[in-house]
């Protein structure tokens, strides 16, 4: 049984609201996955802050209208599931990439970031982006390195003096 007009409108509104908040989107063909495998994929997506939904292409085109993912409209053909990254740009790509390694039936068709559509081959680059926490840790380490090096250098001068005095003391005691 098909969806009623009200259900379709609600679905379009839901996907449009998610698309407005999302950082990136991945479209993947799910033909060949069982219901159990789809449930496992949905569970994995939820755990990683990814909105995953199978939407009819016509409804998906309406949902992404007016968002930065409007560029995807021409690519929405065939049985696709849409995965939107809500927390960090690489989350959806990491989920789809990891799941497609286990299940070859899941084929990435498109990747959209920043108002541009990229081929499926760019999934690897998007998946390798660091999470927000990892990026902040890398930035902090980069900022901390010069200060730490300066502190070590400044600490070395008195340390060298202490070692020299200790060596002179040992030499006098030995003599």
From Swiss-Prot:
<comment type="function">
    <text>Forms part of the ribosomal stalk, playing a central role in the interaction of the ribosome with GTP-bound translation factors.</text>
</comment>
<comment type="similarity">
    <text>Belongs to the universal ribosomal protein uL10 family.</text>
</comment>
<dbReference type="GO" id="GO:0003735">
    <property type="term" value="F:structural constituent of ribosome"/>
</dbReference>
<dbReference type="GO" id="GO:0015934">
    <property type="term" value="C:large ribosomal subunit"/>
</dbReference>
<dbReference type="GO" id="GO:0006412">
    <property type="term" value="P:translation"/>
</dbReference>
<keyword id="KW-0687">Ribonucleoprotein</keyword>
<dbReference type="InterPro" id="IPR047865">
    <property type="entry name" value="Ribosomal_uL10_bac_type"/>
</dbReference>
<dbReference type="InterPro" id="IPR043141">
    <property type="entry name" value="Ribosomal_uL10-like_sf"/>
</dbReference>
<dbReference type="GO" id="GO:0070180">
    <property type="term" value="F:large ribosomal subunit rRNA binding"/>
</dbReference>
<protein>
    <recommendedName>
        <fullName>Large ribosomal subunit protein uL10</fullName>
    </recommendedName>
</protein>
<dbReference type="Pfam" id="PF00466">
    <property type="entry name" value="Ribosomal_L10"/>
</dbReference>
<dbReference type="InterPro" id="IPR022973">
    <property type="entry name" value="Ribosomal_uL10_bac"/>
</dbReference>
<dbReference type="InterPro" id="IPR001790">
    <property type="entry name" value="Ribosomal_uL10"/>
</dbReference>
<keyword id="KW-0689">Ribosomal protein</keyword>
<keyword id="KW-0699">rRNA-binding</keyword>
<keyword id="KW-0694">RNA-binding</keyword>
<dbReference type="InterPro" id="IPR002363">
    <property type="entry name" value="Ribosomal_uL10_CS_bac"/>
</dbReference>
<comment type="subunit">
    <text>Part of the ribosomal stalk of the 50S ribosomal subunit. The N-terminus interacts with L11 and the large rRNA to form the base of the stalk. The C-terminus forms an elongated spine to which L12 dimers bind in a sequential fashion forming a multimeric L10(L12)X complex.</text>
</comment>
């Amino acid at each position: 049984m098909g969806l009623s007009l009200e259900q379709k409108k609600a679905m379009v509104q839901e996907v449009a609201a998610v698309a407005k908040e999302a950082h990136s989107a991945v479209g993947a063909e799910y033909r060949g996955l069982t219901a159990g495998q789809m449930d496992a994929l949905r569970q994995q997506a939820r755990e990683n802050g990814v909105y995953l939904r199978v939407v009819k292409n016509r409804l998906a085109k309406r949902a992404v209208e007016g968002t930065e993912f409007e560029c995807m409209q021409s690519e929405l053909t065939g049985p696709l599931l849409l995965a939107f990254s809500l927390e960090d740009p690489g989350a959806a790509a990491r989920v789809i990439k990891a799941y497609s390694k286990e299940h070859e039936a899941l084929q990435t068709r498109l990747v959209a970031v920043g108002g541009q559509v990229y081929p499926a081959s760019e999934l690897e680059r998007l998946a390798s982006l660091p999470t927000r926490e990892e990026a902040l840790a890398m930035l902090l380490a980069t900022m901390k390195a010069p200060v730490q090096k300066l502190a070590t250098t400044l600490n070395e001068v008195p340390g060298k003096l202490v070692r020299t005095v200790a060596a002179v003391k040992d030499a006098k005691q030995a003599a």
